Curated annotation (Swiss-Prot):
Family designation: Belongs to the UbiA prenyltransferase family. Protoheme IX farnesyltransferase subfamily.
GO cellular component, one term: plasma membrane
Keywords annotated in UniProt: Cell inner membrane, Cell membrane, Heme biosynthesis, Membrane, Transferase, Transmembrane, Transmembrane helix
Signal peptide limits: none
TM helices/strands, residue ranges: 55-75, 101-121, 124-144, 152-172, 180-200, 237-257, 278-298
Compartment annotation: Cell inner membrane
Protein name, entry field: Protoheme IX farnesyltransferase
HAMAP family given in the database record: CyoE_CtaB (MF_00154)
Entry-linked PROSITE patterns: UBIA
A Pfam family assignment: UbiA
Pathway connected to this protein: Porphyrin-containing compound metabolism; heme O biosynthesis; heme O from protoheme: step 1/1
Organism, scientific name: Synechococcus sp. (strain CC9311)
Note: Carbon 2 of the heme B porphyrin ring is defined according to the Fischer nomenclature.
């Protein structure tokens, strides 16, 4: 496979926006997708829509917890980042931000997140947010990432917790809808991340991180991506039943998203060494998850409920006609 792309070539927005060091270590570009899945978790409950104060506290607390996790991840990996050309210019390894300042920022964000979620939402949402933080830093970054090719499969639990936070914020408990979106994000994560790992495999190899493309090569990796891509598509259709209402609209609108994801997964599987295919899948997978969450929210609007009733009426008429003919 040709040499790895730089992260800037994969995510070109980094060339256009120079963040201050204290914000850079919080990894703010990852936060919007986490908040989108939080909203998706809310939309899957009977508690939707939330009051404005509760919504703001949930998203604000989630953003602070995610920022704290990003800072702690950077602190843990600063020596590793300093050994890679791609990451050596980051705030901590380059010396633009001191570790002590970063640690104080991480603790402050954690405490602020906990206070906001406990006071403005509920203890379950606060506890789940802190669980997500700990699982990202301890389970994924410290334990799994340097030890196994399946690091992102198990470690992906950290990124899948926000839907549970959203469901807990809306109702005070986690219903089946929240668990469905948790599972969807879990199976979405490997295909998304391994597409990026294909592009950055030389960096991971240089520092001894056993990502799947490094250990098994592109052929095995793209086959695994294909399996998880198919699992994501199949699982996504369960959202039709996971939604309290509006499932028919969601089921209709998810079709083009799944069609495009399937196309990109199959193209990469057919050309394991094609860097453009891997880059395209990585980028589309982000838009895909944003799209799923947007559809979940749209499906809870009043017009979607009407569409649901109309579809059910048509199905009842068709099924009644079929039974009449059959008899």
């Amino acid at each position: 496979m040709p040499p790895s792309l730089t992260r800037e070539e994969v995510v070109p927005s980094r060339k256009r926006i120079k963040l201050p060091p204290w914000l850079e270590v919080a990894k703010p570009r990852l936060i919007p997708l986490l908040l989108a899945t939080t909203l998706g978790g809310m939309a899957l409950t009977e508690g939707w829509p939330l009051s404005s104060p509760r919504l703001v506290c949930t998203l604000g607390g989630g953003a602070l917890a995610a920022a704290a996790a990003g800072v702690l991840n950077c602190l843990w990996e600063q020596e590793l980042d300093g050994r890679m050309l791609r990451t050596s210019g980051r705030a901590l390894p380059s010396g633009r931000l001191s570790p002590s300042a970063a640690f104080v920022g991480a603790v402050s964000c954690t405490l602020a997140a906990a206070a906001l979620l406990v006071s403005g939402v509920n203890c379950l949402a606060a506890g789940l947010s802190l669980l997500g933080l700990c699982s990202y830093v301890l389970l994924y970054t410290a334990l799994l990432k340097p030890r196994t090719t399946q690091n992102i499969v198990v470690g992906g639990v950290a990124g899948a917790i926000p839907p549970l936070v959203g469901a807990a914020a809306a109702t005070g408990h986690i219903g089946l809808g929240g668990w469905w979106l948790f599972a969807l994000v879990m199976v979405w994560t490997p295909a998304h991340f391994w597409a990026l790992a294909l592009l950055l495999h030389d960096d991971y190899r240089a520092v001894g991180i056993p990502m799947l493309p490094v250990v098994k090569g592109p052929l095995v990796t793209t086959r695994a991506i294909r399996r998880y891509g198919w699992a994501t598509i199949l699982l996504s259709f369960l959202g039709i039943w996971a939604l309290p209402e509006g499932g028919a609209l969601y089921g209709l609108l998810i079709l083009p998203f799944n069609g495009r994801l399937l196309q990109m997964v199959e193209r990469l599987a057919a050309e394991p060494n094609n860097r453009d295919r891997a880059k395209g899948l990585f980028r589309w997978s982000i838009l895909y998850l944003f799209g799923v969450c947007l559809l979940l929210v749209m499906s809870r609007m009043s017009g979607a409920a009407q569409f649901d009733l109309q579809v059910r009426a048509v199905v009842d008429i068709l099924s009644g006609g079929f039974l009449t003919v059959a008899s």
